[in-house]
Amino acid sequence: MKQPQLQRFFDAAHYRSAHNEMPYVNARGELKRIDRLVEFDSEVWVLDYKTGASHDPAPYRAQMNEYRGAMQSVYADTTVRCALIFSDGMLSEM
């Protein structure tokens, strides 16, 4: 991993478990997939990959809020944090 700020999300020595393309059914009964969910001892991170040129997180806020809500119901006693990871390695927490 060339981006040090991302290493803890992809190096298994740093997290408890990780899941790619994790499916869940939202409140409307739609099947959705979270790009990567990473479980640490004290928190869970929902990561979504973006390949566009813009680093503006605004267009993705509703999507990430939905992911956070869905995962907060699963990990009720754990902090759920969300971030976008752009193709250039930039991490934008939402």
Label the predicted regions.
Residues M1-M94:
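Structural signature of nuclease core domains in nucleic-acid processing machines
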